Amino acid sequence: MAIINMSDLDLQGKRVLIREDLNVPVSNGVVTSDARLRASLPTIELALAKGAAVMVMSHLGRPTEGEYNPEYSMQPVVDYLAKALSCPVRLATDYLDGVDVAVGEVVVFENVRFNVGEGKNNEALSKKMAALCDVYVMDAFGTAHRAQASTHGVGMFAPIACAGPLLAQELDALGKALDNPARPMVAIVGGSKVSTKLTVLESLSGIVDQLVVGGGIANTFIAAAGYNVGKSLYEADLIDEAKRLVANAKSRGADIPVPTDVVVAGEFSPTAAATLKSVSEVADGEMIFDIGPDSAEALAKIIESAGTIVWNGPVGVFEFDQFGEGTKRIAQAIADSKAFSIAGGGDTLAAVDKYGIADKVSYISTGGGAFLEFLEGKELPAVAMLEKRGA
C-alpha cells in the first residue's frame, strides 16, 4: 500500500488537520469513557512535537445534520484534551471560512456532523475543509469505512493526505492477521445473528484453518448439524447457508466445529438457572446461552496451537456470569497463546475488559464497523483515498 505516513513528514510550521475518532460517551458535559481519546493522544502529541499548528476534527453522536445541538458539542472533548495535553486547546465553532491556529496550539473543530453535506461527502464542504490545512491526517480507523466529507472528500483535495500513526498501526495489524497469517489461523466469530455476519463468515471460511462460531450464530450451525435448539435464538432460513459454509470449509481442509455440550436455561435473565447438557439433549422449552466446559476446552486447545487468532464476538451471554464461562475460557486461551492475536468489535472489547486480558492481546482494534468490513475483504473508502493520494 502506497500510503504516506504522517510520522515520515516534516510538519514544522505546517497547518495540520487531523481527523480522529473522538466519538465518546458524554454525560452531563463530562466524558464517561475515554478509550478513544487516549488512543488519539500520541498522534496529536507527535504533530505538536514536529512543530505543527494542529487542528483536530471528529463527529460525536448522531445529531441532525446541519443543526447545532449543544448536546453533541465537542466542548467536553476539548476540556478533556486541555487536561491531557500540556498546551492550549480551544474549540472553533465557526471554522469553514478560515481559522487562526498558531504553532504549538491545538484547535478542535465543532462536531463535523453540524455541517450540511458531511454525510454525503459534499464536494464544496470537502474543499473548504481542505483549504484550512497544508497536511490532512486521516487517523480515524473507526470511520474509515464511511465516505464522508471529513474522512474522504477533504483528503482528495488537501495539498497532502496521509495516515496517522493510529490508522497506520491498525492497517499493519490487520494486514499481518489477514494478508500473510502465521498458520494455523483461527477465527472466532460470535454475535446473535448469522445474517449480520454472513459476509464475514464467508470471507473468513475461505482463509482460516478453524472457524469457531459462538452466540446465536452457533445455534444456527447447531440446528444445521441436525440438533434441536429449543427456543434458542437461531435463523431457520439460514440453515442451508450454514451447511454450505461447513461444506466449503471442509473442502479446503478447514473446520467449523459445533459444540458438543451447551449451557441452557428456560428464560433470558440475570437470575436464570443454568443447566449443562449434551448438545443432543436440548429440550423444546430451553434456550442455549453458552458452550459447555468440554466444548470450551476443545476450543482452547485449537487456540493453543494457533499461529494467528482473529476474535470478533463472544461465544455466550457473558454479561450474565452463569453464561460467561465459555467466553472466559476462550479469553484465557487467547491471553496464554503465543500467537499473533487481534480482537475487535464492541462486545469483544467488553469481554477483553471483563476478563482483564487487554495487555495479552497483540492488537485491539478501535473500529467496530470498519473492523468487520476489513474482515469481509471490502475496500475502506478512506484507505482507498490515502492509497490514491500516496501513489
From Swiss-Prot:
Protein name per its UniProtKB record: Phosphoglycerate kinase
Keywords: ATP-binding, Cytoplasm, Glycolysis, Kinase, Nucleotide-binding, Transferase
Keyword Endoplasmic reticulum: no
Pathway(s) where this gene product acts: Carbohydrate degradation; glycolysis; pyruvate from D-glyceraldehyde 3-phosphate: step 2/5
Subcellular location: Cytoplasm
Binding sites annotated in the UniProt record for substrate: D21, L22, N23, R36, H59, L60, G61, R62, R113, R146
Organism: Shewanella baltica (strain OS223)
Disulfide topology: none
